[in-house]
Amino acid sequence: MLTWLNRNNLDFPPLEKALREPDGLLAAGGDLSADRLIKAYRHGCFPWFQEGQPILWWSPDPRTVLLPEELHISRSLGKVLRQSRYRVTFDTDFARVIKACAAPRSYANETWITGSMQDAYLELHRRGHAHSVEVWDQDELVGGLYGLAMGQLFFGESMFSRADNASKVGFATLVEHLTDWGFVLIDCQMPTQHLHSFGARSIPRQTFADYLARHLDQPTDADWLSRRV
């Protein structure tokens, strides 16, 4: 039976209570307050829902992740990176990045990054939990992504690209820095061919929960605002 959350209680049900069909649906309801979102990521679930639906919280099994040391750079992407066509920055325009990620895609008329979701993650950014990667072609924003950093874990949320390989350059650059800073895992949530091309793989939900327990409160050398690549 699906658990409905109380707005006055931030607790989530145990991850093993998630439904098998649809895979990983853990709870519904609640709100998108910063405190609840922080609690959700620390618990091992994330919000994903369409406009007009209740807030839905997910913890899929298996979970798609990327271990930074397993990053795979294709020959073609390596060539693009060596050409230094794009400039990459961190945390210089979070609002534009999340708005661009929310724009409808050619393969989908609707977006799950609703106005309320954008507001919620902007608040997380103001609190220092959510971060953005911007990819520039001169002064034009052509790609980027955003997610949350907690302890030695980075939780990827969404990316966009308006130029060839722009989001790939942003993601590869992010992983390089996360590796240098001491991060041990990037949560990719759900499998995609794009992520698998970088070396992402699926792990059991319990293994993901073990990573949370071991690394959520560990320090890193992260230095977001000084990074201009």
Curated annotation (Swiss-Prot):
GO MF annotation, one: leucyl-tRNA--protein transferase activity
Gene Ontology CC annotations of this record: cytoplasm
Entry-linked Pfam families: Leu_Phe_trans
Catalytic activity: N-terminal L-lysyl-[protein] + L-leucyl-tRNA(Leu) = N-terminal L-leucyl-L-lysyl-[protein] + tRNA(Leu) + H(+); N-terminal L-arginyl-[protein] + L-leucyl-tRNA(Leu) = N-terminal L-leucyl-L-arginyl-[protein] + tRNA(Leu) + H(+); L-phenylalanyl-tRNA(Phe) + an N-terminal L-alpha-aminoacyl-[protein] = an N-terminal L-phenylalanyl-L-alpha-aminoacyl-[protein] + tRNA(Phe)
Enzyme Commission number: 2.3.2.6
Subcellular location field: Cytoplasm
Keywords assigned by UniProt, alphabetized: Acyltransferase, Cytoplasm, Transferase
Keyword Cytoplasm: yes
Main location: cytoplasm
Family membership: Belongs to the L/F-transferase family.
PANTHER family assigned: LEUCYL/PHENYLALANYL-TRNA--PROTEIN TRANSFERASE, LEUCYL_PHENYLALANYL-TRNA--PROTEIN TRANSFERASE
Name under which the protein is recorded: Leucyl/phenylalanyl-tRNA--protein transferase
